[in-house]
Amino acid sequence: MAAAIMAAEQEAAKGGGRNRGGVQRVEGKLRASVEKGDYYEAHQMYRTLFFRYMSQGKYVEARELMYSGALLFFSHNQQNSAADLSMLVLESLEKSDAKVTDDLLENLAKLFSLMDPNSPERVAFVSRALKWSSGGSGKLGHPKLHQLLAITLWKDGEGCANMLVEYSSSRGYRSEVDMFVAQAVLQFLCLKNKTSASVVFTTYTQKHPSIEKGPPFVQPLLNFIWFLLLAVDGGKLTVFTVLCEQYQPSLKRDPMYNEYLDRIGQLFFGVPPKQTSSYGGLLGNLLNSLMGTGEDDDTEDGQEDSSPIELD
C-alpha cells in the first residue's frame, strides 16, 4: 500500500495542471488504507507526504491533505493520529503566507470541535490557532475564530472545564486558580446555560490539582460560585442578594463579576434590567463574539431576556 501511495504522489508531482487530480488519488489510497484499519501505516504516510509537500513549497496541498486526513481519523475514533494531523494543519499555516479566511477559520474550529476534551493537544491546538489567526497584530486572535470556538465550548461544559484545568495548570498563576472557573460559570449563566455552568464547575473543582476537595472550599470565590448555583436553582432574590453582599471582597477581584451578576439577577431572579457593557475575561474573550456587542442587539436581547426563567 505504501508503494502505491508513493507512486500516486510521484504522479501528482509530475502532473502540472493535473496536480489536484493526483492529490485526490493520493487521498483515495490513504483513505482506503484507513478504511482497512491500517491506522499506523496510514498515519506515517500522511506525515511523510506532509513534509515532502512542505519541502517543495506545496503548502496548500499539505494543508488540505492533513485536514482531510484528520477528519478521516476522527471519524474512525483515532484521536491521537487525528490530533497530530490537526497540528500539522497549523504548522502549514504558520510556515506559509496563508491569509486568514473564513474557510480556514471554520476548518480550524471544526478540528477543535472533534478533539477529545481530555486531550492535552486541544489546549496547544487552540493556543496556536488563535496566535496564527491574529496575524501578528494582536494577542487574542481573530474575532471570527473566537466566535466559532465559543460555540463549541458553550455546548460542552465538561470539555470547557478540562481545557480550563489544563490552561490554568500550565499557564496560570496558582493564586488565580479560582478565577478561571468563576469566569466560565458566570458567563455560562449569562447565556442561560445553567447545565453547562454546573458541569464546568463540578468538573473543574474535582480535577484541578491545586483545588482541595470540597465543598466547602478553601477559596472563598469557589464557595460563592457553589452557593450561586444552588441559589439559581431556588430562584429566591433574597438569597441571591445576601450572597452577593457577603462575598463582595471576593467579587472585587475582577470588576466584571458584578456586571455578570447584574445580568444573572435579571435572568434568574427577576431583577429589573440595567444597561450593561460587553462581557470580558478569559472565556469571555471567546464568548464575547458569540453574544454580540452591538447596541441594537443588546437592547433587543435585554428586552427579550429580562423576564425571570421559570424554575421548578
Curated annotation (Swiss-Prot):
Cellular component, GO, one term: BAT3 complex
Region (Disordered) residue spans: 290-312
GO BP term, pick one: protein insertion into ER membrane
Domain of life: Eukaryota
Pfam families: GET4
Subcellular location: Cytoplasm, Cytosol
Record-linked InterPro entries: GET4, TPR-like_helical_dom_sf
Biased segments, Acidic residues type: 294-304
Keywords: Cytoplasm, Transport
Known function: As part of a cytosolic protein quality control complex, the BAG6/BAT3 complex, maintains misfolded and hydrophobic patches-containing proteins in a soluble state and participates in their proper delivery to the endoplasmic reticulum or alternatively can promote their sorting to the proteasome where they undergo degradation. The BAG6/BAT3 complex is involved in the post-translational delivery of tail-anchored/type II transmembrane proteins to the endoplasmic reticulum membrane.
Similarity comment: Belongs to the GET4 family.
PANTHER family: GOLGI TO ER TRAFFIC PROTEIN 4 HOMOLOG
Subunit structure of this chain's protein: Component of the BAG6/BAT3 complex.
Stated name of the protein: Golgi to ER traffic protein 4 homolog
Species per Swiss-Prot/TrEMBL record: Gallus gallus
Gene: GET4
